Design a protein with these regions (language model features):
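Mg2+-dependent phosphoryl-transfer active-site scaffold
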Residues: 4-209
Length: 209
Protein backbone atom coordinates (compact mmCIF):
# COMPACT_ATOMS: atom_id res chain seq x y z
CA UNK A 1 0.00 0.00 0.00
CA UNK A 2 1.33 3.45 -0.91
CA UNK A 3 0.50 6.46 1.26
CA UNK A 4 1.04 9.98 -0.01
CA UNK A 5 1.03 12.96 2.32
CA UNK A 6 2.10 16.59 2.45
CA UNK A 7 3.94 16.47 5.76
CA UNK A 8 7.66 17.29 5.79
CA UNK A 9 9.92 14.26 5.96
CA UNK A 10 10.76 14.31 9.68
CA UNK A 11 7.12 14.41 10.75
CA UNK A 12 6.32 11.59 8.33
CA UNK A 13 9.27 9.56 9.66
CA UNK A 14 8.19 10.09 13.27
CA UNK A 15 4.80 8.69 12.29
CA UNK A 16 6.52 5.52 11.08
CA UNK A 17 6.40 6.26 7.36
CA UNK A 18 9.32 5.80 4.97
CA UNK A 19 10.34 8.63 2.65
CA UNK A 20 11.41 7.83 -0.90
CA UNK A 21 12.89 10.24 -3.43
CA UNK A 22 11.95 9.48 -7.04
CA UNK A 23 14.12 11.14 -9.67
CA UNK A 24 12.94 11.87 -13.18
CA UNK A 25 16.10 11.47 -15.26
CA UNK A 26 16.40 12.24 -18.97
CA UNK A 27 19.28 9.76 -18.99
CA UNK A 28 16.86 6.85 -18.61
CA UNK A 29 14.99 7.98 -21.73
CA UNK A 30 18.27 8.25 -23.64
CA UNK A 31 19.21 4.70 -22.61
CA UNK A 32 15.79 3.39 -23.67
CA UNK A 33 15.97 5.10 -27.08
CA UNK A 34 19.54 3.89 -27.57
CA UNK A 35 18.56 0.29 -26.93
CA UNK A 36 15.72 0.58 -29.45
CA UNK A 37 18.10 1.97 -32.08
CA UNK A 38 20.60 -0.83 -31.47
CA UNK A 39 17.79 -3.40 -31.64
CA UNK A 40 17.07 -2.34 -35.23
CA UNK A 41 20.36 -4.02 -36.20
CA UNK A 42 20.75 -6.43 -33.29
CA UNK A 43 17.36 -7.66 -32.02
CA UNK A 44 19.06 -9.71 -29.28
CA UNK A 45 20.78 -6.75 -27.59
CA UNK A 46 19.56 -6.03 -24.06
CA UNK A 47 20.91 -3.24 -21.90
CA UNK A 48 20.71 -5.38 -18.76
CA UNK A 49 22.96 -8.02 -20.35
CA UNK A 50 25.94 -5.80 -21.13
CA UNK A 51 29.43 -6.87 -20.07
CA UNK A 52 30.53 -4.93 -16.98
CA UNK A 53 34.11 -6.10 -17.51
CA UNK A 54 34.56 -4.66 -21.02
CA UNK A 55 38.04 -3.12 -20.81
CA UNK A 56 37.37 -0.81 -23.78
CA UNK A 57 34.68 0.93 -21.72
CA UNK A 58 37.07 1.53 -18.84
CA UNK A 59 39.75 2.75 -21.24
CA UNK A 60 37.26 5.28 -22.60
CA UNK A 61 36.28 6.43 -19.10
CA UNK A 62 39.95 6.71 -18.11
CA UNK A 63 40.56 8.99 -21.09
CA UNK A 64 38.04 11.49 -19.71
CA UNK A 65 35.83 11.35 -22.81
CA UNK A 66 32.59 11.29 -20.84
CA UNK A 67 30.45 14.08 -22.31
CA UNK A 68 26.82 13.07 -21.92
CA UNK A 69 27.46 10.42 -19.28
CA UNK A 70 25.28 11.00 -16.22
CA UNK A 71 27.36 12.08 -13.19
CA UNK A 72 30.63 11.62 -15.08
CA UNK A 73 30.67 14.58 -17.45
CA UNK A 74 31.81 17.53 -15.32
CA UNK A 75 35.37 18.78 -15.82
CA UNK A 76 36.26 17.80 -12.26
CA UNK A 77 34.88 14.30 -12.70
CA UNK A 78 36.76 13.88 -15.99
CA UNK A 79 39.97 14.80 -14.21
CA UNK A 80 39.17 12.37 -11.38
CA UNK A 81 38.53 9.57 -13.88
CA UNK A 82 41.83 10.18 -15.65
CA UNK A 83 43.71 9.99 -12.35
CA UNK A 84 41.83 6.95 -11.03
CA UNK A 85 41.90 4.95 -14.27
CA UNK A 86 38.99 2.70 -13.25
CA UNK A 87 39.03 -0.92 -14.37
CA UNK A 88 35.99 -2.29 -12.56
CA UNK A 89 32.41 -1.20 -11.90
CA UNK A 90 33.16 -0.82 -8.18
CA UNK A 91 35.63 1.96 -9.01
CA UNK A 92 32.93 3.97 -10.78
CA UNK A 93 30.51 3.50 -7.89
CA UNK A 94 33.18 4.57 -5.41
CA UNK A 95 34.15 7.65 -7.43
CA UNK A 96 30.56 8.86 -7.71
CA UNK A 97 30.16 8.42 -3.94
CA UNK A 98 33.45 10.19 -3.19
CA UNK A 99 32.98 13.10 -5.59
CA UNK A 100 31.30 15.56 -3.21
CA UNK A 101 32.40 17.99 -0.50
CA UNK A 102 34.09 16.14 2.34
CA UNK A 103 34.88 12.68 0.98
CA UNK A 104 36.45 14.18 -2.16
CA UNK A 105 39.70 14.54 -0.20
CA UNK A 106 39.88 10.74 -0.04
CA UNK A 107 40.04 10.28 -3.83
CA UNK A 108 43.87 10.58 -3.98
CA UNK A 109 44.17 8.04 -1.14
CA UNK A 110 41.86 5.62 -2.98
CA UNK A 111 43.85 6.10 -6.19
CA UNK A 112 47.26 5.64 -4.55
CA UNK A 113 46.17 2.43 -2.83
CA UNK A 114 44.45 1.14 -5.97
CA UNK A 115 47.62 1.59 -8.02
CA UNK A 116 49.97 0.22 -5.36
CA UNK A 117 51.65 3.53 -4.58
CA UNK A 118 50.79 3.12 -0.91
CA UNK A 119 49.42 0.36 1.30
CA UNK A 120 45.77 0.59 2.43
CA UNK A 121 45.22 1.48 6.08
CA UNK A 122 42.45 -0.73 7.40
CA UNK A 123 42.53 0.97 10.83
CA UNK A 124 42.21 -2.38 12.63
CA UNK A 125 42.62 -6.04 11.58
CA UNK A 126 38.90 -6.65 12.20
CA UNK A 127 38.06 -4.07 9.54
CA UNK A 128 40.16 -5.40 6.67
CA UNK A 129 37.34 -7.46 5.17
CA UNK A 130 34.98 -4.47 5.36
CA UNK A 131 37.38 -1.91 3.90
CA UNK A 132 39.37 -4.03 1.45
CA UNK A 133 36.98 -3.42 -1.50
CA UNK A 134 37.54 0.34 -1.10
CA UNK A 135 41.28 0.19 -0.35
CA UNK A 136 40.86 1.18 3.28
CA UNK A 137 38.76 4.26 2.53
CA UNK A 138 35.41 4.50 4.31
CA UNK A 139 32.95 5.47 1.58
CA UNK A 140 29.52 4.00 2.26
CA UNK A 141 27.07 4.20 5.15
CA UNK A 142 26.88 0.41 5.08
CA UNK A 143 30.59 0.30 5.92
CA UNK A 144 30.03 2.57 8.93
CA UNK A 145 27.31 0.21 10.14
CA UNK A 146 29.50 -2.85 9.61
CA UNK A 147 32.39 -1.21 11.48
CA UNK A 148 30.14 -0.51 14.46
CA UNK A 149 29.02 -4.14 14.46
CA UNK A 150 32.49 -5.62 14.02
CA UNK A 151 34.31 -3.49 16.58
CA UNK A 152 31.71 -2.48 19.13
CA UNK A 153 29.13 -5.25 19.03
CA UNK A 154 26.32 -3.06 17.72
CA UNK A 155 23.24 -4.93 16.59
CA UNK A 156 22.00 -4.17 13.08
CA UNK A 157 19.31 -1.97 14.62
CA UNK A 158 21.81 -0.07 16.77
CA UNK A 159 24.10 0.42 13.78
CA UNK A 160 21.19 1.90 11.86
CA UNK A 161 20.55 4.33 14.71
CA UNK A 162 24.19 5.41 14.43
CA UNK A 163 23.76 5.86 10.67
CA UNK A 164 20.67 8.00 11.16
CA UNK A 165 22.35 10.10 13.86
CA UNK A 166 25.12 10.87 11.38
CA UNK A 167 22.74 11.56 8.53
CA UNK A 168 20.66 13.98 10.60
CA UNK A 169 23.74 15.72 12.02
CA UNK A 170 22.34 15.62 15.58
CA UNK A 171 25.39 16.41 17.71
CA UNK A 172 23.88 15.30 21.05
CA UNK A 173 22.81 11.94 19.63
CA UNK A 174 26.16 11.56 17.88
CA UNK A 175 28.05 12.07 21.16
CA UNK A 176 25.85 9.43 22.75
CA UNK A 177 26.62 7.03 19.92
CA UNK A 178 30.35 7.77 20.20
CA UNK A 179 30.31 6.78 23.85
CA UNK A 180 28.44 3.57 22.99
CA UNK A 181 30.94 2.85 20.19
CA UNK A 182 34.04 3.37 22.34
CA UNK A 183 32.71 1.41 25.31
CA UNK A 184 31.57 -1.44 23.08
CA UNK A 185 34.97 -1.65 21.42
CA UNK A 186 36.69 -1.59 24.83
CA UNK A 187 34.62 -4.60 25.90
CA UNK A 188 35.91 -6.37 22.79
CA UNK A 189 39.53 -5.80 23.80
CA UNK A 190 40.19 -2.62 21.82
CA UNK A 191 41.70 0.33 23.66
CA UNK A 192 39.53 3.40 24.08
CA UNK A 193 42.12 5.57 22.33
CA UNK A 194 42.10 3.35 19.23
CA UNK A 195 38.30 3.14 19.26
CA UNK A 196 37.98 6.92 19.59
CA UNK A 197 40.44 7.36 16.72
CA UNK A 198 38.42 5.05 14.49
CA UNK A 199 35.23 6.90 15.40
CA UNK A 200 36.92 10.12 14.28
CA UNK A 201 37.40 8.46 10.88
CA UNK A 202 33.69 7.71 10.53
CA UNK A 203 32.40 10.88 12.18
CA UNK A 204 32.72 12.99 8.99
CA UNK A 205 29.65 11.10 7.75
CA UNK A 206 27.73 13.48 10.03
CA UNK A 207 28.74 16.23 7.62
CA UNK A 208 28.04 14.56 4.28
CA UNK A 209 26.59 11.07 4.80
Amino acid sequence: MCIRDRFEMYSAENAGLVKFDFLGLKTLTVIDKTQKLVNEKDPNFKIDKINYEDQKVYDLLSSGKTVGLFQLESSGMKDALMHMKPNRLEDIIALVALYRPGPMSNIPIYNDCKHGIKEPDYLHPKLEEILKPTYGVIIYQEQVMQIAQALSGFTAGEADILRRAMGKKKRAELEKQKQRFVEGAFKNGISKDIAAGIFLKIEPFAEYG
